[in-house]
């Protein structure tokens, strides 16, 4: 009888130890910011942009890493990017803190020029105009269905930014999302022969980006599938559902590369599992 009780206690202690270890590991994994370095090569990348470094911040959702986001700022700064791109959901519609976001941006823009596009949370935010003006006032380039040229070492590439499709619903313009995005992209690409980099929050529109002939896409939104399962990948992502096709990392199809950031913060689901927050660093390599 005593032996059975000892065995039961031992099993219970083992279960509790495993649960405690999982809790500690998950807590660490939600705060241990990492850098995911990705190299993108193409013969369309001009020689002047070989070695060009782009830091991507996505889906911050008002999160803070260190007081005043010092850890996040240090992580970006240590990787010496040429530019920083923010691919939406900088704020969170459920717990918006404009001061936290703008304080981070004021410091980040001292590291490198910032180019910003919206996500679905900005589209749902009644104070979006205030956010936009705050970003622009400190020098952020806000791209709302716009294209700009980047110059480096005598070469140029075209950077395009798309507003999140939910802004069309907000403005009472109802349209099928892929068709609407395709029309916008084709208009912006009509006269462009440069290597094209697209900032767009939505990875599920990859087929549209391919069909429009975009060279490189920076996206987010999927939060890495929130819970990453060994040998499987992400469990669930907005607008993709269970076992999302585009949840994290580099995807290549035809001549289009898409980088999907796992993001940094959380939103409706307040924690991640096996899915550390990340800053993505893309280094361009010319094959021309």
For the regions a protein language model found, what residue spans apply to each?
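N-terminal membrane-anchoring alpha-helices
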Residues: 1-48
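Acidic/histidine-rich helix-loop elements
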Residues: 27, 54-70, 90-99, 122-129, ...
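Beta-strand-turn-beta hairpins that frame and shape the catalytic cleft
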Residues: 41-55, 147-161, 252-258, 284, ...
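Short, Asp-centered acidic motifs that coordinate Mg2+ and/or phosphate
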Residues: 82-83, 115, 140-141, 157, ...
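Binuclear metal-dependent hydrolase catalytic cores centered on His/Asp/Glu-rich metal-binding motifs
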Residues: 133, 137-139, 152-196, 206-207, ...
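Conserved beta-sheet core of the metallophosphoesterase superfamily
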Residues: 202-280
């Amino acid at each position: 009888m005593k032996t059975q009780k000892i065995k039961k206690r031992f099993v219970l202690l083992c279960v509790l130890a495993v649960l405690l270890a999982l809790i500690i590991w998950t807590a660490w994994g939600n705060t241990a910011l990492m850098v995911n370095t990705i190299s993108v090569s193409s013969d369309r990348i001009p020689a002047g942009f070989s070695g060009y470094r782009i830091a991507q911040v996505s889906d911050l959702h008002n999160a803070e890493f260190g007081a005043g986001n010092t850890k996040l700022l240090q992580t970006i700064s240590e990787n010496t990017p040429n530019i920083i791109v923010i691919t939406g959901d900088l704020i969170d519609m459920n717990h918006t803190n404009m001061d936290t976001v703008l304080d981070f941006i004021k410091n980040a823009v001292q590291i490198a020029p910032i180019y910003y596009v919206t996500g679905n949370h900005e589209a749902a935010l009644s104070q979006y105009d205030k956010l936009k003006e705050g970003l622009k006032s400190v020098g952020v380039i806000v791209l709302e269905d716009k294209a700009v040229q980047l110059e480096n070492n005598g070469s140029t590439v075209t950077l395009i930014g798309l507003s999140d499709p939910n802004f069309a619903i907000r403005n009472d313009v109802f349209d099928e999302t892929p068709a609407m995005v395709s029309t916008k992209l084709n208009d912006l690409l009509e006269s462009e022969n440069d290597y094209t980099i697209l900032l767009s929050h939505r990875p599920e529109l990859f087929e549209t980006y391919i069909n429009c002939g975009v060279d490189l896409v920076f996206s987010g939104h999927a939060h890495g599938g929130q819970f990453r399962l060994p040998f499987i990948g992400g469990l669930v992502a907005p607008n993709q559902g269970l076992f999302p096709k585009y949840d994290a990392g580099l995807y290549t199809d035809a001549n289009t590369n898409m980088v999907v950031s796992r993001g940094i913060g959380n939103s409706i689901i307040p924690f991640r599992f096996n899915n550390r927050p990340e800053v993505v660093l893309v280094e361009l390599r010319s094959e021309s």
